[in-house]
Amino acid sequence: MTAILERRESESLWGRFCNWITSTENRLYIGWFGVLMIPTLLTATSVFIIAFIAAPPVDIDGIREPVSGSLLYGNNIISGAIIPTSAAIGLHFYPIWEAASVDEWLYNGGPYELIVLHFLLGVACYMGREWELSFRLGMRPWIAVAYSAPVAAATAVFLIYPIGQGSFSDGMPLGISGTFNFMIVFQAEHNILMHPFHMLGVAGVFGSSLFSAMHGSLVTSSLIRETTENESANEGYRFGQEEETYNIVAAHGYFGRLIFQYASFNNSRSLHFFLAAWPVVGIWFTALGISTMAFNLNGFNFNQSVVDSQGRVINTWADIINRANLGMEVMHERNAHNFPLDLAAMEAPSVNG
């Protein structure tokens, strides 16, 4: 009888825990995805802060030339970064217990792999938590779908690209100048500016900025005034009010006359779907482009293929970009190799005389 009562009490505790985890009455919704999200993001954040402040230099290229990234080793907020895991480790799973000592783990850039893997797991769980909360509230799942765009982008640069290139040392450093270095090297090695998916991503980001500004300014300019001239128009809004807060007919008419009639939405729902879908699809394409270039399916490289009727080369901006890429690649990892791969693969010119 005692054993039966204890089991029932245990089940009751588990049931109360389940109800608390999945309750939508909590100030912050936890959910089953949150059970995994909270420890992974806390771990990633804690290790990032500690490593950014005090991590020793990392032998990123595997040639015994460690690179400093922390504040205590001479960097500032702009130049500091979490240096990626050493090329000597490659794609190996490298937890602390796989190293001979903590010093070795730090020297080989173990914190980077720890942070990145916990971060990716955490943001994926955050996306799942968004879906879970939407489901329990009876909402549609599009919030989680929209969030999948930055999750896909982060996964592309932190996981897919290193897998394609064969080493976590090719991942994006976790810092401001390190991010810029990653972008420059990526352009040099993959010609991303000439990749159609990157172009779609640029259209998504810049286009969504334009559309967001246009929508916000149109709504703000066509508010239904509920206050006097001496009060802010914003004071006329009550949270949860059933009435429209702005005149969509006026906004539609203004924009239709400014450009042309069918450039303006007359359906608020389709308008907001468009505002959400445009940047999400653009960033999806960018993430897909990074993932394809990870396996060296690179951007267009015309290689002086534009010629006139006589076969003479017509120089284009694409050729200028190619020359810039070679210059950037020469400067990249200059102590790890003598020549960029594009130059080293060519035959040596013949010398007469």
Swiss-Prot record:
- Give the GO terms filed under biological process for this record: photosynthetic electron transport in photosystem II; response to herbicide
Matching InterPro entries: D1/D2, Photo_II_D1/D2_sf, Photo_RC_L/M, Photo_RC_L/M_CS, PSII_D1
GO terms (molecular function) for this protein are: chlorophyll binding; electron transporter, transferring electrons within the cyclic electron transport pathway of photosynthesis activity; iron ion binding; oxidoreductase activity, acting on diphenols and related substances as donors, oxygen as acceptor; oxygen evolving activity
How does the entry describe its membrane topology? Multi-pass membrane protein
* Catalytic reactions of this protein: 2 a plastoquinone + 4 hnu + 2 H2O = 2 a plastoquinol + O2
Q: Which residues are involved in binding a quinone?
A: H215, S264, F265
Which residues participate in [CaMn4O5] cluster binding? D170, E189, H332, E333, D342, A344
Function, as annotated, reads: Photosystem II (PSII) is a light-driven water:plastoquinone oxidoreductase that uses light energy to abstract electrons from H(2)O, generating O(2) and a proton gradient subsequently used for ATP formation. It consists of a core antenna complex that captures photons, and an electron transfer chain that converts photonic excitation into a charge separation. The D1/D2 (PsbA/PsbD) reaction center heterodimer binds P680, the primary electron donor of PSII as well as several subsequent electron acceptors.
What else does the entry mention about this protein? 2 of the reaction center chlorophylls (ChlD1 and ChlD2) are entirely coordinated by water. Herbicides such as atrazine, BNT, diuron or ioxynil bind in the Q(B) binding site and block subsequent electron transfer.
Alphabetized NCBIfam families for the sequence: psbA
Q: What is this protein called?
A: Photosystem II protein D1
Q: Which organism is it from?
A: Vigna unguiculata
